């Protein structure tokens, strides 16, 4: 994963929480049911958790409240700063989905919300292979992110964003690496996971992959 988005996230850090809680009209549907989505990801998690893309710590707080041990990985310096202000005892390290410090302790769940789309499909597959090697039978990967049932469905959402004059959203959908459910399902099945998808809003699905 390139670090081309780091500057964007440093700039976004101070207003990120406002965006996810619905103050940005263009992203209102993307972040609809936000708290419910975070709650469900936390509920699906088991044991020791490795979280990629901690952001400002909104999911992390829920995981800690459920008494999970959490190791957080976050590329943005400003996001890490805000997360540490919210959660002073959080173990959070600089890194991303593909480049992160060595994790020496056993991990039972790997989680991420609104972030896996920063990887190309090739990078996604590489990441999933690595994570599969970290997990034992019954362990999980739980991701919530924008994804689509097909390329056609993705194009329809881009077209609708343009009709609504949501130009930032349309550009985002065209320039980030949002993928499809069949592609993700194949990547996980190749690494011996069973996969289940749950739709949470017009954009976001929760992916739960359990290691066989």
Model-predicted regions and their roles:
Residues 99-105:
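Short amphipathic alpha-helix with an adjacent loop that forms part of the alpha/beta core around
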Residues 191-212:
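Core SAM-dependent methyltransferase catalytic element
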Residues 114-115:
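Short catalytic micro-motifs in class I SAM-dependent methyltransferases
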Residues 144-191, 196-198:
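C-terminal alpha-helical "lid/dimerization" subdomain adjacent to the S-adenosyl-L-methionine
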Residues 1-44:
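Conserved class I S-adenosyl-L-methionine
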Residues 111:
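A conserved beta-strand element that flanks and buttresses the S-adenosyl-L-methionine
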Residues 125-137:
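A short glycine-rich, Lys/Arg-flanked "PGG" loop and its adjoining helix->strand segment in the class I
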Residues 52, 56-99:
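Class I SAM-dependent methyltransferase SAM/SAH-binding core
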């Amino acid at each position: 994963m390139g670090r081309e988005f780091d500057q964007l996230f440093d700039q976004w850090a101070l207003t990120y929480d406002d965006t996810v809680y619905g103050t940005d009209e263009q992203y209102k549907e993307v972040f609809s049911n936000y708290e419910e989505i975070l709650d469900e990801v936390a509920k699906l998690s088991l044991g020791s958790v490795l979280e990629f893309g901690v952001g400002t710590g909104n999911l992390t707080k829920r995981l800690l409240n459920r008494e999970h041990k959490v190791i957080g990985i976050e590329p943005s310096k400003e996001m890490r700063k805000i997360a540490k202000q919210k959660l002073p005892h959080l173990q959070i390290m600089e890194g991303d989905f593909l480049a992160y410090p060595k994790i020496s302790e056993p991990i039972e769940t790997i989680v991420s919300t609104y972030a896996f789309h920063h990887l190309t499909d090739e990078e996604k597959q590489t990441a999933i292979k690595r994570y599969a090697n970290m997990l034992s039978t019954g362990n999980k990967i739980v991701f919530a992110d924008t994804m689509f049932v097909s390329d056609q469905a993705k194009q329809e959402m881009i077209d609708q964003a343009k009709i609504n004059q949501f130009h930032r959203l349309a550009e985002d959908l065209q320039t980030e690496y949002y993928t499809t459910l069949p592609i993700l399902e194949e990547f996980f099945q190749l690494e011996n996971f069973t996969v289940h998808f749950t739709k949470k809003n017009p954009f976001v699905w929760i992916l739960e992959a359990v290691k066989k």
